[in-house]
Amino acid sequence: MALTVDVAGPAPWGFRITGGRDFHTPIMVTKVAERGKAKDADLRPGDIIVAINGESAEGMLHAEAQSKIRQSPSPLRLQLDRSQATSPGQTNGDSSLEVLATRFQGSVRTYTESQSSLRSSYSSPTSLSPRAGSPFSPPPSSSSLTGEAAISRSFQSLACSPGLPAADRLSYSGRPGSRQAGLGRAGDSAVLVLPPSPGPRSSRPSMDSEGGSLLLDEDSEVFKMLQENREGRAAPRQSSSFRLLQEALEAEERGGTPAFLPSSLSPQSSLPASRALATPPKLHTCEKCSTSIANQAVRIQEGRYRHPGCYTCADCGLNLKMRGHFWVGDELYCEKHARQRYSAPATLSSRA
């Protein structure tokens, strides 16, 4: 329906548009502001703008149409093409409840007739029953499961899921002639694994006669995935270094001979591997605190070791690990305090 609308100005006019030549759609009103000028002029969402102030809007770009509407003098004259179809939330002037009720009943009657025609087209039992092997086929009863294996819909979803979350709850228990995997939650179907048989095998699992149980072949992909998930969850192993350290600490607490713990700063043993493992040497003893060094040791001289925390200046307590030490008598000093005790630098012996 073609009509002309005059929107009183000035701008803004109170509506939005969409479409244009660049969108390959006609220019259409998409939103009208409440209590706006376009609302007062009876402009509605869904109206197609044919002309703006007498100029055809068929070949206009979206930005061009926006510019002409914004810069239009008052009043803004729009030639519209309004569809007769009623949009949701609008009645196109039909405010009578009887008219609306009649339209609603007519739409309901149309829907009912379409459903009846659909049911009549599928009235044949063969057309309604799904084909064998389809995912929508219902599982047969337990009495008819004699020749061909069947699988329930719940197990199909378990087998087709990529992550197999239910496989974490499977636990195997011994059984004569088969192994049974029971799900952790009560009410779930159990999975039975049959030993390989000499006859031809079916690619699908079968149902057990006890009811609700599924039979899996050991060569099936589902069973292999379940086995891989179980083997991948093995308990973490303790590292050999940590085990040696733990044994050394326990032996030291008991007052016995601690086991040998190799260190990056300790001298490497020249004994064969078999002899070194059989009779491990003692741990190094710190010459300052007279305790065993269980982890890292600082080698000062041949047969003299200290903890990294005990390798300090005898005067100021500065750690000498990254600085080196100076001997003054039988004590270790940093460079500053060693020079204070000896004025002649030639008498100092240093070790970097």
UniProtKB/Swiss-Prot annotation:
A Pfam family recorded for this sequence: LIM
Molecular function terms from GO: actin binding; metal ion binding; muscle alpha-actinin binding; ubiquitin protein ligase binding
Subcellular location: Cytoplasm; Nucleus
GO biological process: actin cytoskeleton organization; heart development; muscle structure development; protein catabolic process
Signal peptide feature range: none
Domain PDZ: 1-84
Record-level GO cellular component terms: adherens junction; filamentous actin; nucleus; stress fiber; Z disc
Segments for region (Disordered): 67-97, 111-149, 170-213
Biased composition (Low complexity): 111-135
Assigned keywords, A-Z: Cytoplasm, Cytoskeleton, LIM domain, Metal-binding, Nucleus, Phosphoprotein, Zinc
UniProt cross-references to SUPFAM superfamilies, sorted A to Z: Glucocorticoid receptor-like (DNA-binding domain), PDZ domain-like
Residues recorded with modification Phosphothreonine: 126
Residue ranges of coiled coil: none
LIM zinc-binding domain: residues covered: 284-344
Positions bearing Phosphoserine: 124, 127, 129, 134, 137, 143, 161, 197, 203, 213, 266
Quaternary state and interactors: Interacts with alpha-actinins ACTN1 and ACTN4, FLNA and MYH9. Interacts (via LIM zinc-binding domain) with MKRN2.
Name of the protein this chain belongs to: PDZ and LIM domain protein 2
Gene that this sequence comes from: PDLIM2
